[in-house]
Regions:
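FAD-binding glycine-rich core of flavoenzymes that anchor FAD
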Residues: 1-32, 52-55
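Conserved hydrophobic/aromatic beta-strand scaffold that supports enzyme active sites
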Residues: 21, 45-47, 54, 72-76, ...
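Cytochrome P450 C-terminal beta-domain/meander region
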Residues: 34-58, 255-257
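Alpha-helical interface subdomain recognition
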Residues: 50-55, 121, 148-259
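A short core secondary-structure module
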Residues: 58-103
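Glycine-rich phosphate/pyrophosphate-binding beta-alpha loops
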Residues: 62-67, 112, 149-154
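Flexible, small-/acidic-enriched active-site or ligand-binding loops
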Residues: 99-126
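Long, acidic (Asp/Glu-rich), low-complexity accessory segments flanking structured domains
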Residues: 123-141
């Protein structure tokens, strides 16, 4: 709605500390929102009920990126328990200071520490009726418009991590001497470095192909994006593991960056 854009967009643009978080994932069923279910039993546990001109939200969200510090939340909730998740869920704009909203905890994560991870609880959280963003059946199409580019960006981040690990390793094996010669001159090491390069190039090519398909509106773009997420994360993990092994004991030291 225009009035919500006028109120919140300037703060989101002008204040770097004014963060927005998407509250989707739940303790039971994780991100079922993105799976091709449409049975009532697969709908969200977080409920939103319209009572006397106000939406009343009850439920819990967890693993929410920026959830601990966010000042504004886009919350996804079940608004029609008679149908499945694709047709019976809606999104709402919920300010952090709304009565009934509690940021319960900040989760410590092994990776992705560039943003925090929070758990959000809604206990009779009351919203004005006009804080509804997208209702029921229109939600799936609308959310895909921002989530698909986000998935491609995540794959690009993975690629960047892999490239950094490869570059550090390539420099290390040229400098470190064992058996009277640099590690790179040992064929077993060179072969592993080549394998790392092949994996990264496959991710890079698939990433470009998928981004082009999304821009062109190719029907299979959504499927390609899902495949890209898997391919990028798995191949980059293998690259980073090999990078650590080629560093030897130094690969476990924090000062090296590989760990």
């Amino acid at each position: 709605p225009d009035h919500l854009q006028e109120k919140w967009f300037p703060r989101l643009v002008e204040d770097p500390s004014f963060l927005l978080a998407h509250a989707l994932t739940e303790p039971r069923g994780a991100s079922d929102r993105w799976l091709p279910y449409n049975a009532p039993s697969a709908n969200m546990d977080t409920r939103a009920v319209l009572e006397n001109g106000q939406w009343v939200l009850n439920g819990r969200k967890h693993f929410i990126s920026n959830g601990f510090d966010a000042k504004l939340f886009v919350v996804y909730a079940n608004t029609n328990p008679e149908v499945g998740i694709l047709d019976g869920s809606s999104s709402f704009l919920v300010p952090r200071d709304t009565p009934g909203l509690t940021v319960a905890r900040c989760n410590e994560t092994m990776g992705g520490r560039y943003m925090n991870n929070g758990e959000i609880v809604f206990d009779d959280c009351m919203l004005p009726e006009d804080h509804l963003l997208i209702r029921d059946t229109a939600l799936q199409k609308k959310t895909d418009t921002y989530s698909n580019p986000g998935r491609i960006i995540q794959a690009a981040k993975n690629l960047g991590v892999g490239v950094a690990a490869f570059d550090d390793t390539a420099a290390y094996v040229q400098e470190y001497v064992q058996g009277g010669r640099p590690l790179i001159q040992h064929q077993a090491v060179a072969v592993r470095l080549a394998d790392m390069a092949i994996k990264l190039e496959s991710v890079r090519c698939f990433l470009r192909q998928t981004a082009q398909a999304l821009d062109a509106g190719v029907a299979e773009a959504g499927q390609m994006i899902t495949m890209l997420k898997v391919h990028a994360s798995e191949e980059v993990l293998k690259v980073c593991q090999q990078a650590m092994e080629l560093h030897g004991g130094a690969g476990t030291m924090l000062e090296m960056g590989i760990e």
